[in-house]
Amino acid sequence: MGSKVEQQYKLLNAELMDQVQKQRLEIGEYRKRVISLEREIMDIREEHVLQNHRQRMENISIVRSLMLSLNVDSDSLAVRQEPAPAAQINRPSGPRRSSREICKDMRRTCALARTTRPISPRRSSSVTSTVSSTSRRSSAEVQSEVVTTRIPEDRRANKPTPPPRRPAELVFDEDDSDDDFDEAVSPVEETQTEQNEENNRLFSIIEENGSEGESTDSSSSCEAIYCDTTFESSPPNAQVTVTPSGRALREVDTNIPVAVSLSRGKETGKGSWLAISVAVEDSPQEPSIQCPRLAVTRPSQSSGIFPDVNGLTPRRSLFNGIGKMAGSTSTPKSFLVEEMPSIRTRSRTAANKKSENTDMSSSFCNNSARPSRSCRPTSLVEPSLKNKLRNGSKGKAKAKK
């Protein structure tokens, strides 16, 4: 029993498998058929769209041709509006024509139906006569201009040359001369220009004389100002000492004055006078302190840059040494009163002399950029390496223990 049931189940299963296989094949065929139908539908739709586009273009061309034919003339439109005969016209059945051929035929009929034609622009006799008259007038004007330009040129050539003028006149009349040459000279304007030139000459001569007088006055006033700045010099019997720096400067520029030793004193009732000696450097341009205070600087020689006071130049001031070393002042040595040190202060100053000497020596070393002699080693023997490498404090502590 069990085997029969199993066999039946197997037969049913085989039949079912056959049915399923057949259905699958049918479904595949149906799908292929659907795809082919969809493709045909797409082709038909594409043809329909193209046909609609063609029909639209044909309609547009027909409408254009109708508009052209209607806009030709009112007479042709009135004739066309007449009622046509009732009899039907039998049109011959021929081959179908394209829209282009129809448009060409309609354009030909429209061109034949036109009664008025636009006149092309052409040159008439009146226009040519006006052109010839204008050309004659222009040629006559050009000839008259040429003649008028030749006349002033001849007058300029025949005009006598003026006498030579001074530089001040030439500078004064530069603008007027340029304007006279640029403009065209007429016979009425020539007399005016000659009068203006004479007036300008007289005015320039007056101006030149005035400027010369002003220059002489200014030079004399300047000389008077500069002459007032002189100082009392030494008597003529005094000997003049010439320094080498003064010689070198005088060879370069001869305007540098000779060094003069100045003296200042106050006469008493008996006629005796006191002379104060002032320290004078080698520079001959500034022999005393009062000179730079009272000197008048000329505007031509003064420059906008202030000289360097600390610069090493031959014309440095006497104030360079002030403030650099201890105890230096601007007063001369003759006015300084040296006090003699007392016996009590000698012992105090003796102890401080060594420290001052060391300070002065170090300062001179720094100023002269040389090392002091105290840096020199006392012996040339090299120290032992044992003392260098070992710690002295630890060694001493061990030795004490």
UniProtKB/Swiss-Prot annotation:
State how changing residue 375 to Y affects the protein, per the record. In mei-S332-2; induces missegregation of chromatids during meiosis
Report if keyword Cell division is assigned. Answer: yes
Known outcome of mutating residue 13 to I = In mei-S332-9; induces missegregation of chromatids during meiosis
Q: What the entry says about post-translational processing?
A: Phosphorylation by polo-like kinase (PLK) on Thr-331 antagonizes cohesive function. Phosphorylation on Thr-331 at the metaphase anaphase transition leads to its dissociation from centromeres. In contrast, phosphorylation by aurB/ial on either Ser-124, Ser-125 or Ser-126 is required for association with centromeres.
Q: What is its main location?
A: nucleus
Where are the Phosphoserine modifications? 124-126
List the InterPro entries hit by this protein, alphabetically.
Shugoshin_C (IPR011515), Shugoshin_N (IPR011516)
Coiled-coil spans in chain: 3-49
Q: Does the keyword Phosphoprotein apply?
A: yes
Q: Report keywords, A-Z.
A: Cell cycle, Cell division, Centromere, Chromosome, Chromosome partition, Coiled coil, Developmental protein, Meiosis, Mitosis, Phosphoprotein
Compositionally biased spans, kind Low complexity? 114-137
Q: What does this protein do?
A: Plays a central role in chromosome cohesion during meiosis and mitosis by preventing premature dissociation of cohesin complex from centromeres after prophase, when most of cohesin complex dissociates from chromosomes arms. May act by protecting or Rad21 from cleavage by Sse/separase. Required during meiosis in both males and females.
Q: How does it assemble?
A: Homodimer. Interacts with Incenp.
Its name, as the record gives it, is: Shugoshin
The source organism is Drosophila melanogaster
Q: Which gene encodes it?
A: mei-S332
